[in-house]
Regions:
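ABC ATPase nucleotide-binding domains
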Residues: 2, 14-20, 258, 264-283
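Conserved ABC transporter NBD signature motif
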Residues: 90-98, 107
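Conserved ABC ATPase "signature" region
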Residues: 143-161
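Catalytic Walker B motif of ABC-type/P-loop ATPase nucleotide-binding domains
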Residues: 190-194
């Protein structure tokens, strides 16, 4: 906990009134060896700077949440991380290999990506998830490919709808299909842009528990953007807060303070700890 904060007996972290500005040396280093490194990345649309000097890393077995208000570059950063957008400066490294020098197929073997909004094509749920095996198929599909898809469909509660067409299912169901497809890619790094945005609370909890299970079981690294601070605080290991296209702060759960939330989001909050998890409560 920073020296300008202390916890009262009510479990609420209270901030001293002086500024947080002098304490901006929040390091974005991740514990352990980073499997994915964002090294000095900058990106602009025409002359408008969206990302500047981004440095961040994520380790195997870790979930990193990218947080911040709308329009700060969270989704753009995720799209740079798998080369959908090419950074104008800096590099994205997976296992110290530069993604910009890889083919699309090689990138897909290393990085799985789920967009915030996914297009619904005319194919079945099963075939859509099966596409996740495409980077690994050398000649034809194997029994192992089919078994992996069937297992993933069962884990995500999609078995009963595997023969339905994905343009006929709900937005929340499509979201689960897309996450399921990314996981059967067996990537080293999983990138999830608002993975719970189209889901009700029950499904949000279910899919985040599944993501946590996949990360722990397969020892992959996951980076996800999220709007819901409390869900992020519950499921992620570390947090990067973005502001104005830059990383404003990087911390674990103990570094999430009322002062930091106010500086990033512009709202006054209390942060209480419940079962050793921080909970953000707007005032």
């Amino acid at each position: 906990m920073h020296d300008h904060e202390h916890m009262h007996g009510d479990g609420v972290i209270h901030s001293h009134p002086h500024s947080h500005e002098e304490n901006h040396e929040h390091h974005s280093d991740c514990p352990g060896e980073a499997i994915l490194k964002v090294d000095g990345v900058a990106f602009s649309y025409k002359s408008h700077s969206v990302l500047a000097d981004i440095e961040v890393g994520v380790s195997r077995g870790e979930i990193l949440a990218i947080l911040g208000p709308n329009g700060v570059g969270k989704s753009t950063l995720l799209r740079c991380m798998n080369m959908i957008l090419r950074p104008q400066k800096g590099a994205i490294l997976v296992d110290n290999a530069d993604l910009s020098k890889m083919s699309a197929n090689e990138i897909a073997k290393n990085v799985g990506y789920v967009a915030q909004r996914s297009e619904a094509a005319r194919m079945t749920v099963f075939d859509s998830v099966l596409l996740g095996r495409k980077p690994h198929i050398s000649w034809k599909l194997t029994k192992e490919d089919y078994a992996m898809v069937e297992d993933a469909l069962a884990k995500f509660g999609l078995s009963s709808m595997q023969l339905r067409y994905i343009d006929e299912i709900s937005g929340g169901e499509l979201q689960r299909v897309c996450v399921c497809r990314a996981i059967v890619q067996e990537p080293s790094v999983l990138l999830l842009d608002e993975p719970t945005s189209a889901l009700d609370l029950s499904r949000q909890m279910e899919i985040l528990h599944l993501i946590r299970h996949v990360v722990d079981q397969h020892n992959c690294a996951t980076i996800m953007t999220m709007h819901d601070l409390n869900l992020a605080l519950r499921f992620a290991d570390r947090f990067v807060f973005m502001k104005g296209g830059k990383i404003y702060a990087a911390c674990d759960k103990w570094g999430v303070t009322p002062e930091l939330i106010q500086e990033v989001y512009g709202i006054e909050v209390d942060v209480i700890f419940h079962n050793e998890l921080p909970v953000v409560i707007p005032k």
